[in-house]
Regions:
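Transmembrane helix-loop-helix hairpins at membrane boundaries of multipass inner-membrane proteins
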Residues: 1-7, 13, 25-96, 100-124
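Beta-sheet entry/capping signal
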Residues: 9, 93, 134, 143-144
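N-terminal signal-anchor/start-transfer transmembrane helix
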Residues: 12-27, 155
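Functional transmembrane alpha-helices
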Residues: 15, 88, 126, 135-156
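Alpha-helical transmembrane segments of multipass membrane proteins
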Residues: 20-24, 133-138
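Transmembrane alpha-helical core residues of multi-pass small-molecule transporters
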Residues: 40-43, 101, 129, 149-153
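Transmembrane-helix signature of multi-pass solute transporters
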Residues: 46-50, 132-135, 155
């Protein structure tokens, strides 16, 4: 089951992909945009629950193992820049907490923002914000952490 670590990018990737898709939604499809954003956040929440179960041992004890997935981003001469993501018990708990609270915010916003004409833009930026926050949690390279931090600032 630890092979799933190579797919952990889906947790922040789904909200970011949702933000990109929502940016092309027409302003008249307000309810569809809200349900689409909530659906992508719900899938991220389910994926974070899977990561949480991976980070915990089947005997109920918390594992101290850090699972990482690295790949080469680019090579410059003899220098190789490798980036990736990691999963340990602490960020597994944080992934569950952030995706759960984000999902609650997304669901609450359906009713709260239903009369706002810019709800599609709201959900696009909210999805981008949630994806960047989740990217902060799984990054294992300072450059990716900084990029996600800047996107959080941009989306807020």
């Amino acid at each position: 089951m630890s092979d799933w670590i190579s797919y952990i990018w889906l947790i922040p990737g789904l909200p970011v992909l949702s933000a990109l898709i929502l940016s092309f939604f027409p302003a008249t499809s307000r309810k569809g945009a809200a349900y689409f954003a909530c659906g992508s956040m719900a899938l991220s929440f389910i994926a974070s629950l899977i990561c949480f179960s991976i980070a915990n041992d089947s005997s109920g004890e918390v594992s101290v193992e850090r699972l990482t997935h690295n790949f080469t981003w680019f090579d410059v001469g003899s220098t190789t820049v490798r980036i990736g993501w990691l999963l340990d018990p602490l960020n597994a708990v944080m992934l569950v907490m952030v995706t759960f609270i984000s999902l609650l915010v997304f669901i609450y916003s359906i009713g709260y923002m239903k009369k706002d004409p810019r709800i599609v833009r709201f959900y696009a930026f909210l999805s981008l914000f949630a994806g960047a926050m989740l990217g902060l949690l799984i990054s294992n390279h300072l450059l990716i952490l900084f990029m996600c931090w800047e996107v959080v600032g941009l989306a807020s």
